[in-house]
Amino acid sequence: MVTKRIRSEYMKKFKDPKWDTYAKCYEDLLKYRLSRRLLEQAHKPWFWGEWGSETASSGKSTPLSRNKVEPLKTLDEKPERSACVTPEPAAEAETQAAEVQDREHADTNLVPCDAEVAHPEGEEVRGKERSPAVNPDSDTQIQNMSKSKRRSSHKYTRSKVKPQAPKDPDKENRHPFALYGAGEKQTDMASKKTHNVGPAASTAEIHESALRAKTRREVEKQIKRFDKQRARSADLEKSRNKIIPDFNPWMTEYMRCFSARSR
């Protein structure tokens, strides 16, 4: 079954523009856009053909301004200056190295007798460092220190653990909602934490007014639920019994879908 395409009044009146009528306008706009592009890029022209060949050879697209070659004069002048300047620091370094060597030779000629005298003392010191004397008192002190550290660490960890507060059995047995007669009973709230406070009275001491209020709320909830169900069923019946009206030429699509007149 082929469905017939419904055409609105707008679709009948306004059709797609024909190419014959708007071809010249389109070409004029295209020419204008190209001329504007040339004007905007006049300060820095971009040659598309050269750019493509460069990317094919090098693999990177770089603007032409960066590829400019500097004049050869500056390149020739720089190495000449460096050639003139470089030998001076090299000569200075050679003279300094020669002076340092002469000083070292003079010092070595004067030092040997002092080194011979100091040599045995150095050997004794090294021997002491290699074989330190075992002192029993120091060993016992070290052991005692390690034990005391362990004990202190155990004490610190124990102090961190907080003791669990004992549960209040009266609080568990209390009624879930605040009671009307709770204000009449004096309670010692100074010793208790005030957050999440439950009622002071037990379930045996609930006032009759509180129970009546509870039953009233439950009845109201049931009535509301019943009303919602009735409204839902009434809407379904209306939609079923709704008669589809005949075609009305004066009723627009908006009125048919969203207006209250059609309902």
UniProtKB/Swiss-Prot annotation:
Motif ST]-E-Y-X(3)-F motif 1: chain residues: 8-14
Keyword Transit peptide (UniProt): no
A GO CC term attached to the entry: mitotic spindle astral microtubule
Pfam families the UniProt entry points to: CCSAP
InterPro entries (alphabetical): CSAP
Disulfide bonds: none
BP-aspect Gene Ontology terms: brain development; cell division; cilium movement; determination of heart left/right asymmetry; heart development; microtubule cytoskeleton organization; mitotic spindle microtubule depolymerization; neuron development
Biased composition (Low complexity): 85-99
Biased composition (Polar residues): 54-65, 137-146
Biased composition annotated in UniProt, kind: Basic residues: 147-161
Stretches the record annotates as Disordered: 50-207
Family to which the UniProt record says this protein belongs: Belongs to the CCSAP family.
Name by which UniProt lists this protein: Centriole, cilia and spindle-associated protein
Lineage: Eukaryota, Metazoa, Chordata, Craniata, Vertebrata
Gene name in the database record: ccsap
